[in-house]
Amino acid sequence: MGCSAATFILVALFGSSSWMGTNSVWMQLPLLTSELPEQWNLPSYLAGVVQIACIVPLIYTILHKGVKSFTIPTAPLIIALLSLACCCQLGLSFFWSDYSEIFGAPRSWPLYSLLFGLAIVNAMSNVLFMPFMAQFHPAYLNAYFVGMGLSSLAPSLLSLAQGTSMFKCDEKGVAERFPPNFSVSIFFFVIFSFTCVALFAFIALYRSGAHTHFATPNKKEPNEGTPLKKDLNNTSSSRKGDDEDESPIEIHETGAPAIDAIVSELDVTFREELQKSFRDANYLERSAMINDDSEPHPVDYITGVKFTFLLFTTALVNAQMNGIITSVQSYAALPYSQATYHFAVTLSNVVSPLSSFLPFFISVRSIPVLAILTACSTAMTAFIVYLAALSPNLIFNSVTIGSALSIGGSLIAAGLHSYLRVVFASLLREGHQSESRLFWCGVFIQIGSFIGSAVMFPLVNIAHLFTSAPQCKSIS
């Protein structure tokens, strides 16, 4: 069966919904911090909300793996989640600026609630969307990962077109604001429209039956993301008959991948590894896509101490990326200008998906080299924290130098973190128990992200170790 251009586009649009909601809120932080009462503390609150929401897919996977009677049809659940994302995105366009007093302080609870809903949808995409794509021809994985890249790139480009809220200081030291090219409400409404397109694309994709063209004939659960082990064995035995050389593969009944809630841009690496898993599971053999005599190349799998090291560094990198930097970046950039924060956040989200493609060209397997790169990313994170600790003072007492260092540090950190995250997941994915290894990779991703946010939240909001700078400040 050939690949359809229409199906390719539908899959890409469907994949774009994976993390677009959360990314869209993050792209608006430079404007939200200037409008909402939490001000510079807002990013740390939102990071905590996202991490709490990421517990939901973990619970889902535990139930799906541990409770055999727990079954929910995949496609209807995806439609329900995308509908929830549309509702939350539409709600943001109207209620993002609302707040009320809770526990003696003004809180932007509508923003928290709506972001929580979006984060649930985005995190659940890792345990639902990927298994669903296992039912398609492997060539469509390219389209899905293109869509995942768009979920970060599209809000970033839209934010660049929007610009930021500039201001100038009058003689009395009062900031006079100039609005961006279009408002936060319009931004969220455009993202809402994009999410609706993704929802309708999935419905059209499912109704087209493209996923059934690659399904096994005797598959009993059409809504499962991947077939059960017994179905694989039955199909293989019925097709091969007396063939004794078939390689067994260990596939869990759920077919759910790891809970890698933040690792949404593992584009090329996951594509290659999933295609390899399709080949190992005789997907391609059953559909006559490859010859029976093809064999996977031997790989020096990561085990033992190296495996433990990779899990630890995975947690460390994600703690920095999803917990530490997101909590203090406002303090590291806003003292220099609103535009500095805007470009640091926006361009970082452009660099991240692009860096995820680097392992396709530059693959590193050496543990010492990976340790050095991890140390470099940690040093860059420490530099961003140092800039934040200087606030309201400026490094070298210079707006120009400070802005360049703040933006440059954010871009380098984002690039290193994204690259390392892909490489770690690729190495951990290798092996005969690939799903189990990838599951633990996802667990440590979430552990690292949670610890990073849990450590930074009290430091920012309770201990008040970081200080906001006044908008209008004389520079000597």
Swiss-Prot record:
Consequence of gene disruption: RNAi-mediated knockdown causes a severe reduction in the number of laid eggs.
Tissue: Expressed in intestine and pharynx.
Induction: Down-regulated by high levels of riboflavin.
Segments on the Extracellular face: 63-75, 135-140, 207-306, 364-366, 415-437
Biased composition (Basic and acidic residues): 218-232
Keyword Cytoplasm found: no
Superkingdom of the organism of origin: Eukaryota
Gene Ontology cellular component list: plasma membrane
Residues covered by region (Disordered): 215-249
Catalysed reaction equations from the record: riboflavin(in) = riboflavin(out)
Residues linked to a glycan: 233
Topological relation to the membrane, as annotated: Multi-pass membrane protein
GO terms assigned for molecular function: riboflavin transmembrane transporter activity
Subcellular location: Cell membrane
Transmembrane segments: 1-21, 42-62, 76-96, 114-134, 141-161, 186-206, 307-327, 343-363, 367-387, 394-414, 438-458
Assigned keywords, A-Z: Cell membrane, Glycoprotein, Membrane, Transmembrane, Transmembrane helix, Transport
Cytoplasmic-side positions: 22-41, 97-113, 162-185, 328-342, 388-393, 459-476
Pfam families registered for this protein in UniProt: SLC52_ribofla_tr
Chief location bin: membrane
Record-level GO BP terms: IRE1-mediated unfolded protein response; riboflavin transport
Family the entry assigns: Belongs to the riboflavin transporter family.
Function: Riboflavin transporter.
Protein name: Riboflavin transporter rft-2
Designated gene of the protein: rft-2
